[in-house]
């Protein structure tokens, strides 16, 4: 039996795909004990703050518990393989496509508290990754309206800023999770993003909406904490699993997203 921890946006899609593929699984909160008949664990529980990561600057206890203490407690409580859904928002800058071997450069000295917690958790979990996975996703988006969906955020924000970034389509992510459970490729860190990258303006143009644009300087003044903007290298993932290219994923998902509103 598979244990799925988490009841958030990403966990919903993983549960839906597991059901579609007839996995025997149970869905639990992050305080529940691992059942004795469990064979594999997917940890999609965490704390991202509402409406966005700025909330983590004040809710630091919740951020530490959900993103650092919880995955460590889980790893120390069982010998089962675990697939952690984490974040690729641990880098800043475009000097390269960041690989799984690169040390995070967006942490407590220059990052949001959320990103810093994710970077620290990755470091602390590293000794466990000989028998576990850590999926680093970025800017998740999907075909349904949801306050955590990147498309819904872009639709609702009064002003936007243009950056190039890696992105993760949540249905593709869910299929990838199921593939890893079934095939068990090499353990470790994986950048689970749709290959390539895209920009805010490209996505907004695909959605066919008009927005007012901020400069990078204005955006920096408007947010409570700095944001990660970067492109992750996906070659390691591509060697074991194929996800749609970023541009294709945006185009097809936006089409479905719009159709759900008609």
PLM segments and residue spans:
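NAD(P)-cofactor binding segment of oxidoreductase domains
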Residues: 55-83
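NAD(P)-dependent short-chain dehydrogenase/reductase
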Residues: 123-172
């Amino acid at each position: 039996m598979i244990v799925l921890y988490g009841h958030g946006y990403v966990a919903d899609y993983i549960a839906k795909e597991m059901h579609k593929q007839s996995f025997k699984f149970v869905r639990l909160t992050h305080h529940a004990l691992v059942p004795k008949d469990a064979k594999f664990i997917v940890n999609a529980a965490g704390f991202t703050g509402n409406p966005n990561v700025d909330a983590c600057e004040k809710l630091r206890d919740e951020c530490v518990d959900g993103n650092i203490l919880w995955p460590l407690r889980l790893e120390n409580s069982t010998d089962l393989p675990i697939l952690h859904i984490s974040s690729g928002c641990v880098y800043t800058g475009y000097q390269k496509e960041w690989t799984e071997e690169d040390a995070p450069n967006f942490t407590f000295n220059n990052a949001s508290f959320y990103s810093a917690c994710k970077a620290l958790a990755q470091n602390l979990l590293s000794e466990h990754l000989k028998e576990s996975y850590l999926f680093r996703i970025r800017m998740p988006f999907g075909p349904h309206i949801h306050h955590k969906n990147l498309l819904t955020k872009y639709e609702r924000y009064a002003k936007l800023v243009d950056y190039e970034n890696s992105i993760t389509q949540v249905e593709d992510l869910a299929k990838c999770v199921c593939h890893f459970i079934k095939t068990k490729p090499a353990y470790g860190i994986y950048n689970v993003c749709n290959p390539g990258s895209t920009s805010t303006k490209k996505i907004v143009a695909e959605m066919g909406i008009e927005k007012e644009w901020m400069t990078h300087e204005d955006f920096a003044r408007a947010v409570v904490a700095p944001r990660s903007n970067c492109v992750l290298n996906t070659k390691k993932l591509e060697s074991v699993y194929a996800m749609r290219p970023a541009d294709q994923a945006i185009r097809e998902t936006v089409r479905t997203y719009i159709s759900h509103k008609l």
